[in-house]
Amino acid sequence: MTTRIAIDCMGGDHGPSVTVPAAIQFLAEHPSANLVLVGQEGVLRPLLGNHANDSRIRLLHASEIVGMDESPALALRNKKDSSMRVAINQVKAGDADACVSAGNTGALMAISRFVLKMLPGIDRPAICAPLPTVNGHTHMLDLGANVDCGPHHLLQFGIMGAMLVAAMEHKDQPTVGILNIGEEEIKGNEVVKAAAELLRASDLNFIGNVEGDGIYKGEADVIVCDGFVGNVALKTSEGLAQMLASSLRSEFKRNWLTKLAALIAISVLNNFKKRFDHRRYNGAILLGLKGISVKSHGSADILAFGNAISRAYDAAENRVVERISSRIAAMIPAAVENV
């Protein structure tokens, strides 16, 4: 069966000038996939050029656009023909296996939750994305959907993250850690300590507390935290990476000797840049819904948005929603009863 991805082509800082070329490039790399390109047809069709007749592409007109600064509540209530809403509706109707948007994060969360609904046993959706580590990458959630969480929410995040990694990376027992201010069990606030007890009592491969530096050491396949902590950690890391890159460029441009050193080290520098290029990790999945909804960075370029499409495709191909649903049904009652 062909996997079909619906794309909100009007969302993001760059809109169709990025989303349409990224879609074309994705199809070149995934010849068996199909795409539904959602947006203003008069804008999208010229950008497709000869690809407008590609049988793997279906154009679906949507007259409205959700602004990047628009109120999520107003977007949900008033813009029922937005490209974001129509793309999500495709998943709900079974006409697409996943959707991708670079649009307003709050609106995507609100509309996805309203249209797709939550999986039984899951109280809240969580934003999950991969982060680079010294030996590969880790998955971290929540990255901003839920500022305040109870222990049972963090347990649910752990289950969802573990099932995502198990499905997409084919790991039987992915390791799960909880982000904390120390490795000892006595460390942390009451919510984190209670959540650790729930995770420890579950049948997840829980390794205990992970400190902030452990994120990038690759100490766990999945790292659980509330959305406030996760978002701060993510944005701090992005800012640090930008500062280091800027400082490195400045140092190599300082004089003729440092410029020569840069030329000698250029292959090493390019490999380093590629390894930690945030565009490679673009595409955060909203876990916990009865369908796959993927959030791309609003500022994504063609490479980054293409990776978000690929992430949605891989999640659909590996039946992530079904894996989470079956594991939640089996684990949640037992996990809670054992504490």
Curated annotation (Swiss-Prot):
Assigned EC number: 2.3.1.274
Catalytic activity: a fatty acyl-[ACP] + phosphate = an acyl phosphate + holo-[ACP]
This protein's pathway: Lipid metabolism; phospholipid metabolism
Top-level class of the enzyme under EC nomenclature: transferase
Cellular localization per UniProt: Cytoplasm
GO CC annotation: cytoplasm
Any one GO biological process: fatty acid biosynthetic process
Domain of life of the native organism: Bacteria
Primary subcellular site in the record, as a coarse category: cytoplasm
Keyword Lipid biosynthesis: yes
Keyword Transferase: yes
GO molecular function: phosphate:acyl-[acyl carrier protein] acyltransferase activity
Matching Pfam families: FA_synthesis
Keywords associated with the record: Cytoplasm, Lipid biosynthesis, Lipid metabolism, Phospholipid biosynthesis, Phospholipid metabolism, Transferase
Family to which this protein belongs: Belongs to the PlsX family.
Primary role: Catalyzes the reversible formation of acyl-phosphate (acyl-PO(4)) from acyl-[acyl-carrier-protein] (acyl-ACP). This enzyme utilizes acyl-ACP as fatty acyl donor, but not acyl-CoA.
Record note on quaternary structure: Homodimer. Probably interacts with PlsY.
HAMAP family xrefs: PlsX
The protein, known as: Phosphate acyltransferase
